[in-house]
Amino acid sequence: MNFKLSILVLSVILWGCSSGGKVASPWQPAPQQPTPEQPAPEQPAPEQPSPEQPSPEQPSPEQPSPEQPSPEQPDVYTGRIITRDSYVNGNKLINDGFNGDSGIYTISVDTGTPVITPNTSENEHITGHQLQSLSSDDKLLGYYGYVLSYADREILGQNEKYHRSDYILAMNESEINKPTASAQYHGNVFYDRDGAVGQKANIDLFYDSNKSMLTGTITGDSQRDFNFLINNDQKSNNVFEDGTFIAPLTEPSQGSMQGVLNGAFYGKNGEVAAGTIMSSDNESWGGVFGAKVQ
């Protein structure tokens, strides 16, 4: 037994010498192997504010420009022209529209006065004229009157003078205004009768606001028997809501209508009446009139 123990001790000593003198106990735990390094969990980066994107530029709301006053428009005077032209129409009277230009001349309004300017022509000549202005409340409403002229025409080698007479009414149509109260009017008529040109008569009108009725008389001088009753039958409602009117004309000695009066009231409270007269046959007589409240 002691012998076996000695051999065992000796074997141990010899093994220890062969291993560098270090004695490793067979009961020591195996050396700990390093665990593979695990990557640290990625920490979330603090959220960075996204750079502010410029918002698309919005057009600034258009500011209304201050309203500019519109330039004042000149008044326009239009109406009728009744013409007897022996060259063009023989003895017939022609009632046509008028805008200031007759072909032979033009009429413009300068500082409240109608001015006639002859158009350039070597064979047309103005021989006379009379134009009267019509105003209300210091405002020009229009004008009426006549212009006489002649033209040289060569017919079959002969130089002939052909006469023309124009009876003109030109008013500012925007000033038509029906009167609100009964009123009397007095004025003039310029007319042509059977070729006698530039004649003048008186006109008296009465407006009855209760009946919307216009009556009156036209009275010529003693040398020219030019007398008419206006709406002698006294028919009511011959003045319309828009301020225009129409009435038959009869001679005192005749019972039937001989012609027609057409016109309108103009200006403040309808203080002016103006229009045309024309015979039923469009040949015997015709002209224009203007009258103011009395």
Regions found by a protein language model. Give the residues of each.
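C-terminal motif of bacterial Sec signal peptides marking the signal peptidase cleavage site
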Residues: 13-16
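Mature soluble binding/inhibitory domains
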Residues: 18-294
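Sec-dependent signal peptide recognition
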Residues: 2-10
